[in-house]
A protein has these predicted regions:
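C-terminal motif of bacterial Sec signal peptides marking the signal peptidase cleavage site
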Residues: 14-15
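Sec-dependent signal peptide recognition
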Residues: 1-7
C-alpha cells in the first residue's frame, strides 16, 4: 500500500532544479544514405563502440513529395572517434528494440521493409567487424514497442498489433508473456526498476487517443508466477496502477528512454501531444498543409527528463533544440552520459546529426 500511496503523492511531480546539460556534436556517419539521417535505428554501445544499425528515411523524395521510405541494413561503429562500416544486418530493419548486455547488443523485433518481425539477434564487435548470432524469436512479431532492462531481465512492451508484455532472462533469451497492457499502446516508453515495470505515453491505434499517463505494475517473483503466466489487465482488479504522469503534460510518443548508471530513466525527444493527436485525425486534404510546416512548428520536445524510482519524481536534465527529435537512437555512454543518433526533425525529414549529452 505504501508504494501506491507514494505514487499518488508523487504523480506529476518535477524536481525544481535543472541539471546542466552539455551537448557535443559527433562526426557524421560517412555514407550518402545516412547523410540524410535515419530514424528508429538500433543504437547501443558494444564494448567501447557506439553502434548505429538499420533505420529508415526518405532518400530520394521527401514524404511531402510522395517519396518512398527506405529501410537499411548497414551496421556502423564509432571506434576511437572514427566510423567504421562493421557489416550488415540479416534484414533491413527499423523500429526495433536495442538492449546493451555484457559488451554486446541484443536487437529485438522491428519492421523489415513493411513487415513486423519476430527475429532477435546478438551483435558483438570483433576487430571492427560485427558478428551476429541468432537468438530465439519473439513469441509474436513486435515493432515500435517499449523496451527496458532490469538486472538480468529484458522487457518488451506493446507496440504495433499487440498489448503483450514479454520478458526474458539474459543468457537464456526465451521470451514469455508476463502481462497485458490495459489498452494497445504504440511507441510507449518502458522502464523497469525494483520489481516494478513502468510504461509512459504511446498512442492507441484503435481510439487514436494519445496518452499523457504513466502506468506501473509489480512484476517481481512475488507477483509473476514462476511459469510467467499472463496477468490479464482486463480483470476487475487489474494489477496496473497510475504512475507519476509525464512531467510537461505531453506524451512520450516518438521519445526514446535509456536507464542511466545511477538507476534513473532518461527520456529524449518525442512529439507534441496536441499536434500529433490532431494529425491522427487528418483527412487527405490535410496532408499537404500538415507536411509543409517548418520543423519548429511541430514542437517536438527539446527537454530531456529523468525519472527517479526512489523518489517517484521527474527531474529536468536540460533542454536543447538538438533534442527536438522523434524516433532518435539513444544509448548510454561508458561515462554515464548519452549518445543520440538521428531521429525525425519533422514528419518524413530526418536529422543526420549524432551528438552526446553529459551532465
Amino acid at each position: 500500500m505504501r508504494f501506491w500511496v507514494s505514487l499518488i503523492l508523487a504523480a506529476g511531480l518535477v524536481a525544481c532544479h535543472t541539471e546542466t546539460m552539455k551537448v557535443t556534436e559527433l562526426k557524421a556517419i560517412p555514407d550518402a544514405a545516412y547523410a540524410k539521417g535515419v530514424s528508429a535505428p538500433f543504437c547501443g554501445v558494444a564494448g567501447d563502440a557506439l553502434v548505429v544499425a538499420g533505420g529508415a528515411n526518405f532518400p530520394d523524395k521527401s514524404l511531402l513529395e510522395g517519396g518512398a521510405k527506405r529501410v537499411y541494413a548497414d551496421i556502423w561503429a564509432l571506434e576511437a572517434g572514427e566510423w567504421v562500416h562493421a557489416g550488415l544486418l540479416p534484414d533491413s530493419t527499423a523500429y526495433g528494440a536495442t538492449f546493451a548486455v555484457d559488451g554486446a547488443l541484443v536487437l529485438a523485433g522491428g519492421n523489415v521493409c513493411g513487415v513486423t518481425t519476430d527475429k532477435v539477434y546478438e551483435l558483438t564487435l570483433q576487430d571492427g567487424a560485427a558478428v551476429l548470432r541468432a537468438l530465439p524469436p519473439l513469441p509474436e512479431p513486435m515493432e515500435q514497442c517499449g523496451w527496458t532492462r532490469d538486472g538480468d531481465r529484458l522487457y518488451l512492451v506493446g507496440g504495433v498489433g499487440t498489448t503483450g508484455v514479454y520478458a526474458c532472462t539474459v543468457g537464456e533469451y526465451v521470451w514469455t508473456r508476463v502481462a497485458d497492457l490495459p489498452e494497445p499502446l504504440v511507441q510507449p516508453v518502458a522502464f523497469a526498476s525494483g520489481g516494478h515495470l513502468y510504461v509512459w505515453g504511446g498512442f492507441n491505434p484503435e481510439t487514436l487517443e494519445v496518452s499523457d499517463k504513466g502506468l506501473v505494475i509489480p512484476i517481481d517473483s512475488s507477483v509473476i508466477p514462476a511459469d510467467s503466466s499472463v496477468i490479464p489487465a482486463e480483470e476487475p482488479e487489474s494489477p496496473w496502477r497510475e504512475a507519476p504522469s509525464i512531467p510537461d503534460g505531453g506524451t512520450f510518443v516518438g521519445a526514446t528512454g535509456a536507464t542511466l548508471p545511477d538507476g534513473r530513466l532518461a527520456v529524449v525527444g518525442g512529439v507534441n501531444r496536441a499536434i500529433f493527436a490532431r494529425a491522427l485525425h487528418n483527412t487527405p486534404e490535410d496532408r499537404i498543409p500538415y507536411l509543409s510546416k517548418e520543423p519548429a512548428e511541430y514542437q517536438f520536445r527539446q527537454a530531456v527528463y529523468a525519472f527517479d524510482p526512489a523518489s517517484g519524481a521527474w527531474t529536468l536534465l536540460g533542454a536543447d533544440p538538438a533534442c527536438a527529435l522523434a524516433g532518435p537512437g539513444v544509448a548510454v555512454r561508458p561515462d554515464g552520459g548519452l549518445y543520440v543518433a538521428g531521429g525525425e526533425l519533422k514528419p518524413g525529414v530526418r536529422s543526420p546529426k549524432l551528438f552526446s549529452l553529459a551532465w
